[in-house]
Design a protein with these regions (language model features):
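Sec-dependent N-terminal signal peptides
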Residues: 4-14
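Positively charged, low-complexity terminal tracts
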Residues: 18-145
Length: 145
């Protein structure tokens, strides 16, 4: 219940700033917003593609966007692949990716279970863990318009 209240407060306080961030993706509708240590993650859809968007704790930084695919099943596979890849990375190492829109990398932190997904070409970043990525997967099971 406490987590739900925190998420709701984050959603309400993020509203006006989220509108400004949305302009980065040309009026992308934000479907889910999850507060993470050091950042915020949202699921969104634009031009028939599903994206994972991440902002740093400084919510005035630009969001960066990871293209997850055209449908829910593909998006879930993309996130599962990120989790599996992160599991193979040694601590304090990273793997670079390019989704056709942006370059980003998945980095294994020094803390147990810590995974960073960070863009190479944008200011924003997200800090998450395997468990929190699974929460994003769970949220994605809701309909994304």
């Amino acid at each position: 219940m406490k987590k739900l209240v925190i998420i709701l407060i984050a959603l309400l306080s993020f509203g006006a700033i989220a509108d400004a961030q949305v302009s980065v993706t040309k009026k992308t509708k934000i479907e889910r917003l999850i507060s993470l240590r050091g950042g915020y993650v949202s699921m969104s859809r634009h031009n028939d593609l599903i994206y994972l968007s991440v902002w740093s704790d400084n919510r005035f930084d630009e969001a960066y966007i990871i293209n997850l695919g055209r449908d829910k099943a593909t998006a879930m596979q993309s996130l599962e692949a990120l989790i599996e890849i992160a599991d193979t990375i040694k601590k304090d190492e990273s793997i670079d990716f390019n989704d056709g829109l942006h370059e980003y990398y998945v980095y294994r932190g020094l803390l147990k279970g810590e995974i960073w997904i960070k863009a190479n070409d944008r200011a924003g970043y997200g800090i998450t863990s395997k468990g929190e990525l699974k929460k994003i997967l769970d949220h994605l099971t809701f309909e994304v318009y």
